[in-house]
């Protein structure tokens, strides 16, 4: 379990460093195209970090990871079912999964500050809730 906690902590450190790079929500409408693309990349990476942590825990618990075309969404459902995260965390993190999917399949030209604003605004709260859920699960 110590090795798992070290791996999770490394993911947290990466996420923490990303969050420090995010501009305030109010500044988003004034960002240049490449800056908006950078913000979108940070949001995408945040979700990837969350997913990495969930996969680490499921593997440690010997729970098979979902497969198939909807495995990302199924991973969140499985994490909730196994008590790793709460329903509200699954729903909130799911917003970042939806954005990750959009970002991965859209042209950067289709990025708009209005779409990023709620994700930037809520990121710290969602991340805090996620960390609390993970801590509660690991401490059981």
Please provide the spans of the model-predicted regions.
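Solvent-exposed interaction patches of small proteins and small membrane subunits
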Residues: 1-140
């Amino acid at each position: 379990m110590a090795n798992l906690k070290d791996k999770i902590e490394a993911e947290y450190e990466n996420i923490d460093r990303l969050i420090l790079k995010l501009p305030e929500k109010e500044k988003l409408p004034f960002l240049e195209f490449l800056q908006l693309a950078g913000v979108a990349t940070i949001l995408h990476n945040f979700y990837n970090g969350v997913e990495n942590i969930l996969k680490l825990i499921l593997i440690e618990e010997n729970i098979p990871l979902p497969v198939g075309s909807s495995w990302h969404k199924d991973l969140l459902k499985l994490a909730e079912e196994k008590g790793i995260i709460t329903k509200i965390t699954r729903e909130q993190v799911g917003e970042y999964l939806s954005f990750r999917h959009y970002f991965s399949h859209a042209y950067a030209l289709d990025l708009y500050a209005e779409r990023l604003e709620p994700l930037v605004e809520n990121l710290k709260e969602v991340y805090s809730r996620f960390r609390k859920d993970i801590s509660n699960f690991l401490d059981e």
